[in-house]
Amino acid sequence: MLKVFNPSPVQVGSIECLQSAQNWQRKSLSLQGLNLLQSVLIKLTTGKISITTSSGEYITASGPMLIFLAKDQTIHITMEETHEQLNYNLIELDSASIKNAYNFFLYEHADFSAPLTKPTTKHLLAPIETGVARVFNLLHSSNKSQKLSQDKKEYLIRFLLSEFIYEPEAFALFRELSQNTLAENIYNIIISDISRKWALKDISDSLYMSCSTLKRKLKQENTSFS
């Protein structure tokens, strides 16, 4: 598992922990140290969510709400019922999908001047409009069944991310997230065959680099392999 170097280590888990936690059927749940190696899209249908991020942001939202969380951060998250039972789902988005959407938005909005400055936020929020929930559910279920073509999935992702494009930070954030990190490349290799027990040598061979080079580059990203 990939872990972030922290001065005061906290329990680090994958984002799948958040998805499976819904099955606990609690009125509230709190998870510490979820490490986002890919960007995440959360569809909060009912309930309330509070998130503290390693970048210093505090996010709070109530459903129905679409929440985009950028990769390369660790989050502490609390979710609770409001007047209805807590209901949410999430989808991980890789850099290639975000880059595809970003390039499409630039083409469609040629008159829009995308800022070249670094984004000051690592999240975006949008109310869930008509049709969005249905598209999200289709993409979420297809990720499990692998029934949709890649082109169709890219189209659905563009549709969902278009909900955020009029947010001031959206273009700058999508541009930055279009670039793969080494940690994300490793994550993609591992999830391609989750039944396999991956060793450092396996990963380094897949990336055509030595183990020492791999460890050095990961350290530069403030990440380790264990």
Regions found by a protein language model. Give the residues of each.
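Key DNA-contact positions within bacterial/archaeal DNA-binding proteins
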Residues: S212
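A general structural signal for short secondary-structure boundary/capping elements
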Residues: Y88-E92, A110-L116, R134-S141, Y208, ...
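Intrinsically disordered, low-complexity regions enriched in acidic/Ser/Thr/Pro/Gln residues
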Residues: R134, L138, L160-S162, N185
